[in-house]
Amino acid sequence: SARALRTEVAFTILKDGSVAGIEVVVKSGSYGFDAAAMAAIEAAGNAKAFGPLPRTFPGDALPVTFFFTPKGPQ
């Protein structure tokens, strides 16, 4: 069922706000759902939606893990 879908995607936010190393860490069992989750992260990175890392950030990159689940009707 759609409610059981959950995928875990890991990636790195670079200093300029772009992303690298997008990978599915835990698959949902649905190739389409996993691909859509990766595409969402890639699109956000391309749009620099995460913003640049703060100048005071102690490093060149920030590793991040997102968990995706489908949003049902409200």
Regions found by a protein language model. Name each.
Residues 9-10, 21:
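Conserved beta-strand and immediately adjacent loop positions that scaffold enzyme active sites
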Residues 18-52:
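A short, well-structured alpha-helical segment
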